[in-house]
From Swiss-Prot:
The keyword Hydrolase does not apply. Belongs to the iron/ascorbate-dependent oxidoreductase family. Gene3D superfamilies: B-lactam Antibiotic, Isopenicillin N Synthase, Chain (2.60.120.330). Its cofactor is L-ascorbate; Fe(2+). The gene is ANS1. Binds 1 ascorbate molecule per subunit. This is Leucoanthocyanidin dioxygenase 1. Involved in anthocyanin and protoanthocyanidin biosynthesis by catalyzing the oxidation of leucoanthocyanidins into anthocyanidins. It comes from Oryza sativa subsp. japonica (Rice). One of its GO terms (biological process) is anthocyanin-containing compound biosynthetic process. GO terms for molecular function: 2-oxoglutarate-dependent dioxygenase activity; L-ascorbic acid binding; leucocyanidin oxygenase activity; metal ion binding. Keywords: Dioxygenase, Flavonoid biosynthesis, Iron, Metal-binding, Oxidoreductase, Vitamin C.
Amino acid sequence: MTDVELRVEALSLSGVSAIPPEYVRPEEERADLGDALELARAASDDDATARIPVVDISAFDNDGDGRHACVEAVRAAAEEWGVIHIAGHGLPGDVLGRLRAAGEAFFALPIAEKEAYANDPAAGRLQGYGSKLAANASGKREWEDYLFHLVHPDHLADHSLWPANPPEYVPVSRDFGGRVRTLASKLLAILSLGLGLPEETLERRLRGHELAGVDDDLLLQLKINYYPRCPRPDLAVGVEAHTDVSALSFILHNGVPGLQVHHAGSWVTARPEPGTIVVHVGDALEILTNGRYTSVLHRGLVSRDAVRLSWVVFCEPPPESVLLQPVPELLADGADKPLFAPRTFKQHVQRKLFEKLKDQQDNNAAAASNGMRTK
């Protein structure tokens, strides 16, 4: 089978009415799956449905009550939800429009042309154009293709992985990466103040300012997710339930719904909120705050009639030079014990990967004991 045939886009374009069994989710997951468009319409029509908080952070730039209210609103959302719709983010609409247009133009190219940027996870090359071909802990594949690469700092990026076509892709991605880096600092300041800490605390901890000789910048990884039309959205997912390893994740989309977050024991569909971007709290920030801010469990659904694209920027600490552990000031009164052992970001990623592999082995063993075939 060629690389082109392995892409989910090719499978979708083939006109299949059923999906291969490797994409069919385990039976226990299917009860609340469905078409992303239909679930979003139902959520919008039901005022009683839980709604992800919307916070305008432009008030943070002012003194007085507005600034304090902004900090409190972000704090509450990060503690109770782990996800926020951010308005007043300062990202110009024309930049976001150009970014979306460039990503859509890349994924509109023939698959064979996109293959020039193909990654090779088996060889350790994670960046580039790819599909989630390796089975997850569930033993199933995800209904998505993607483009993934470092977008900031620019001097560390491998620009050979940035598409030359469309020509706009490189300049607008570079511009966007720099702007999100500025936004990340602002949000980390707000989140620090929400904990009663000096506003530079969380960023200093993520960049290693507390360690002698260490002052690395945060790394921003851009992933464009492409979710093709799926004939059976009641059986498949674009991205299975997970938390992000990052400190913060920033999400834009093409207007097609699909994001769901887990809150108060159930899945909540993210409603369209014009003019906002979605921000997730990730594992690294949950560790630093000793669980005060919640790394949100989320997933991506697919649709029978619409293609969904999302642009996700993962804001991460340097992989090995920074030790992630709860901020000491949050433990100072002795009332709280550290919930997380110290680890580097690289160690945390490896730990999550090991746990997934162990889950896969346990699932395989259980299936084998029941006389089922395993992959």
